[in-house]
A protein has these predicted regions:
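Compositionally biased intrinsically disordered regions enriched in Thr/Gly
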Residues: 1-138
Length: 138
């Protein structure tokens, strides 16, 4: 990519999904991830990475959390206890952004069966080329 390439302009992708059983919402998932509409290969790489991240998150919710939510819902119904839908969120926070660099972290938060759980991971990006950076390169 040439030196005059347009750097990636970062926006936000927001999406929500709900899973239901017998008309009752048992799982709610939402995400806020970086996105871009910047044309060119750098923008495409960046967009593709986080769109795949979003699909993977919702697939994880479908395959892992939805069965757990069903089990908890059925147990609550059998024991005549109140039920609250399970929650999962994927949220990104930008910590540094300039024309060349982007540093951010993403929290995956789950609340399953009343026990909160959080995993944090960080990413760094060269916005002019659209490639991830190692911590050393930041």
């Amino acid at each position: 990519m040439g030196k005059n390439a347009e750097p990636v302009c970062v926006t936000q992708l927001q999406a929500e999904k709900q899973w239901q059983y017998e008309g009752v919402t048992v799982l709610q998932a939402s995400l806020w991830l970086p996105d871009t509409k910047t044309p060119g290969s750098a923008g495409r790489r960046f967009r593709r990475y986080y769109r795949l991240y979003a699909r993977s998150f919702f697939r994880y919710c479908q395959m892992e959390l939805f069965p757990q939510a069903l089990q908890i819902y059925r147990r609550c119904r059998e024991q005549q206890q109140p039920f609250s839908p399970l929650q999962a969120q994927l949220r990104t926070t930008v910590t540094l952004q300039n024309e060349r660099l982007l540093s951010l972290y993403t929290d995956l938060e789950e609340n399953t069966d009343g026990r909160p759980f959080c995993i944090r991971r960080s990413d760094g990006w060269d916005l002019t080329r659209g490639y991830p950076l190692t911590l050393f390169q930041l």
